[in-house]
């Protein structure tokens, strides 16, 4: 709630109950990226970080990841603010700042509960960041989120929080930046020819123009007169292999990390959105809205 000169401005965050059952297979991952993500979340220790703005589906992806690896033999504990969905078989802790139960206090207690996997809703400060690193380097798997624009800047953000480069490089397994883009209503769509200006704006591959059939949504009551129905995720993944770890140890800048990750197979968010455009899932307007040029 925000008081303004014309009265109270209220924003409601609605959580759909249907999202509880989402699995990794229906979160928009291309097959190759899904294979990479599954590989790293199955490791016995290290950190998996998902970054993006508020409302980019980070928590949904983390819940799906936990459900993927969950078993009776794995002790999974989460620290969240708030607990968005209750997951059977997982120990979920709700933050209560008013009684002193913040992220760092909760984590100090959880370390004595012998968890195998820890989910930290968000790394917000230096103490939380260092506890996460310490936990991941003592034989535990840590999942968390960070507010950052893309995967390379996530590394910079974690360094800014005070994590020493040698510890960050040693503890990271994978970083994934994520965005949500709206999908065209499959029952109300039509063929569309974008202008040369639109294609140049998103740097659409020239060799793909003739072979791509573009679509736009038709506004209808069933899609709330938007032409869109539902959303899908796009992902930008950095696998923190030996070469990437060395770049972090050397305090390489963001551009150097970006170029190295791209050479190692990272698909930037803009390119990931264009892939959805090529297969007719979304529109040029959504690519422009959700991503920026590399």
Name each model feature, range by range.
Residues 1-294:
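Short, flexible helix-loop junctions that flank or precede catalytic/ligand sites
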């Amino acid at each position: 709630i925000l008081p303004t000169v014309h009265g109270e401005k209220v924003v409601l965050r609605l959580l759909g109950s249907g999202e509880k059952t989402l699995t990794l297979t229906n979160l928009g991952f291309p097959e190759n990226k899904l294979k990479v993500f599954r590989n790293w979340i199955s490791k016995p220790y290290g950190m998996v970080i998902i970054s993006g703005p508020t409302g980019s589906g980070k928590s949904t992806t983390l819940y799906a990841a936990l459900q993927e690896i969950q078993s009776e033999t794995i002790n999974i504990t989460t620290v969240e603010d708030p607990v968005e969905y209750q997951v059977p078989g997982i120990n979920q802790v709700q933050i209560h700042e008013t009684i002193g139960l913040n992220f760092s206090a909760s984590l100090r207690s959880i370390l004595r509960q012998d968890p195998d996997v820890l989910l930290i809703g968000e790394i917000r400060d230096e103490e939380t960041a260092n506890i996460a690193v310490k936990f991941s380097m003592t034989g535990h798997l840590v999942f968390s989120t960070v507010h950052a624009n893309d995967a390379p800047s996530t590394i910079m953000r974690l360094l800014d929080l005070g994590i020493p480069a040698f510890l960050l490089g040693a503890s990271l397994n994978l970083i994934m930046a994520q965005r949500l883009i709206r999908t065209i209503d499959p029952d109300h769509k039509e063929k569309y020819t974008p202008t040369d200006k639109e294609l140049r704006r998103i740097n659409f591959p020239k060799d793909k123009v003739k072979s791509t059939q573009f679509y736009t949504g038709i506004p209808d009551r069933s899609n709330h007169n938007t032409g869109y129905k539902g959303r899908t995720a796009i992902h930008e993944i950095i696998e923190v292999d030996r070469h990437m770890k060395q770049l972090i140890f050397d305090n390489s800048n963001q551009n150097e990390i970006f170029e190295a990750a791209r050479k190692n197979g990272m698909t930037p968010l803009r390119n990931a959105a264009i892939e959805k455009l090529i297969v007719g899932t979304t529109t040029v307007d959504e690519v422009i809205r959700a991503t920026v040029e590399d």
